[in-house]
Design a protein with these regions (language model features):
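Gram-negative outer-membrane beta-barrel transporters
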Residues: 24-28, 133-136, 155-235
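Residues that define the transmembrane beta-barrel architecture of outer-membrane proteins
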Residues: 6-12, 49-51, 107-111, 159-163, ...
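Membrane-embedded beta-barrel scaffold of Gram-negative outer-membrane proteins
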Residues: 62, 102-156, 161, 278-283, ...
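C-terminal beta-signal and adjacent terminal beta-strands/loops
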Residues: 176-179, 228-238, 261-324
Length: 324
């Protein structure tokens, strides 16, 4: 089979944006930052013109200057790329691929509320952030994931939503080092053929920890610990369609640990290099078999079995880093 295609399209894009800062009246003032804008585009391939307004406001209240409240909303468009406009149709055993010039950009309306709190504990800086979001989606282009292959349906066939909560505590548990803990909850689904199904990226929860510490009595030796636990992604048998993604992979679990030694520090000397670190990491410390995808095997009775493909097991990594 051989095919030659020539596509000539024109895309015009632009945006307008402004920021307005003001403060409330009174002896104790609250400070506001209002950011608003408009983005527009036109694509000659499908003749679509999109206009997406968006705005955000942040407030530092008078009762505590270490607190920031944020809210943002807007209408967003994601233009389709080549694999999304490619529509494959099989008729009488013949597979035909066409480019869908009637396709539209995927649309999303965002509502995001956030809270930041900066504080000190034992004279060390910390920051706690919380963000809740809801995104209403239209004209979605669904896709199937089979192992590492992604196949798009080639048309706007779904509506959906994404809602979630992200929490993060960031700070210097040890002076001069960065550590954080994050916790996320999410639900993202799409309605296809009258049925709500999870999107391929529907990861319902995730916990991540990054902790750095120095050895007692010296700052030349540094230890880093990383932990991750996340919900497994939905999947189903190949060629069964998104409506039958009724299974979910096991949770992803991983622990990494690393040791670093500072070979050089500039200090007060004149040098282009600030410091040099030599480190060794043990990735996937406990050798957990995390599932990447599934290979489906069919027996003589047409019964299918999912055989897991695993991600990389335990590995040792040596690195040399220079900071200029």
């Amino acid at each position: 089979m051989r095919s030659t295609n020539h596509i000539y399209t024109t895309r015009i894009e632009g945006y307008l944006q402004d920021t307005y800062r003001f403060a409330s009246r009174g002896e104790r003032q609250s400070f506001f930052t209002f950011n608003y804008g408009l983005r527009f585009s036109h694509w000659s391939f499908n003749g679509e013109t999109t206009v997406s307004p968006r705005a955000s406001i942040a407030m530092v209240p008078a009762f505590n200057n270490d607190i920031t409240f944020r809210f943002s909303t807007g209408l967003y468009y994601q233009a389709p790329f080549f694999k999304e406009i490619r529509d494959t149709v099989t008729t009488d055993g013949m597979t035909r691929a066409v480019l869908n010039n009637k396709i539209k950009s995927q649309q999303s309306i965002h509502f995001v509320g956030a809270f930041d709190y900066r504080f000190k504990m034992k004279k060390r800086p910390y920051k706690f952030s919380a963000e809740a979001y809801y995104k209403l989606m239209h004209n979605l282009i669904p896709y199937n994931v089979n192992n590492v292959k992604i196949t798009y349906y080639g048309g706007n066939q779904c509506d959906g939503y994404a809602a979630g909560l992200d929490l993060k505590l960031y700070g210097e548990f040890v002076p001069g080092t960065d550590s954080w803990v994050t916790f996320s909850l999410m639900s993202t689904q799409q309605k296809m053929n009258g049925r709500w199904v999870p999107m391929p990226t529907d990861q319902r929860y995730a916990v991540n920890v990054h902790f750095t510490d120095y050895f007692p009595g010296t700052e030349k030796w540094k230890m880093t610990l990383r932990l991750a636990i996340a919900d497994g992604l939905p999947f189903g048998a190949p060629h069964s369609g998104l409506e039958h993604q009724d299974f979910r992979a096991p949770a992803y679990k991983r622990a990494d640990i690393g040791m670093s030694y500072r070979l050089y520090e500039r200090g007060y000397r004149k040098s282009a290099v600030k410091n040099v670190w030599l480190g060794i990491d043990c990735l996937n410390l406990f050798g957990i078999n995390n599932v990447n995808s599934y290979y489906w095997v069919t027996d003589v009775t047409d019964q299918q079995y999912a055989v897991p493909n695993y991600l990389t097991g335990r590995q040792i990594n040596v690195k040399l880093s220079l900071k200029l």
